[in-house]
Design a protein with these regions (language model features):
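Conserved beta-strand-loop surface patch within small alpha/beta domains used
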Residues: 1-80, 88-142
Length: 142
């Protein structure tokens, strides 16, 4: 099913992830899901709370951040539809760590950031049996 976002929102995500380089950066995707199609309308950046020496290849947030984001999404009449994060100097392909910490109903936008420049964004969704991710069509529009 397609994942849709506008180009300016994609550029906002790219700028955020370029500023966190060489560490991983990330945030939540807000929007709506209808029959498997996801429309992303807003993002919220989240601080990486993983141990400093591990932030170059790991990303984590606090449970308090998660609860706060659910409240913010509800207040805006939106849903948490997914999560975005970077893979510094690595392909935009989910890692085993990503799979082990992912939720099947979320969309995951992973961006390869190479030498502080975002070069590729791909959309993924974890299978319900949690065995692997499937690539989703990413539609970036005007």
């Amino acid at each position: 099913m397609p994942v849709k976002l506008n180009r300016s929102l994609q550029q906002d995500i790219f700028r955020h992830l370029e500023t966190t380089y060489p560490n991983e950066g990330g945030g939540f995707l807000l929007g709506a899901s209808n029959n498997g199609e996801v429309q992303i309308t807003e993002t919220i950046q989240i601080q990486n709370v993983f141990e400093a020496g591990e932030q170059y290849h790991r990303y984590a947030m606090t449970p308090q951040d998660w609860a706060r984001l659910e409240d913010e999404a509800d207040a805006r009449g939106l849903s948490l539809v997914g999560y975005y994060h970077s893979h510094p100097d690595s392909p935009a392909i989910p890692s085993v760590y990503d799979r082990d910490h992912a939720l099947p109903h979320f969309v995951y936008l992973i961006t390869q950031v190479q030498d502080a420049k975002a070069v590729e964004m791909l959309a993924w969704r974890l299978r319900p049996d949690r065995t692997e991710f499937d690539a989703e069509k990413l539609a970036v529009g005007g």
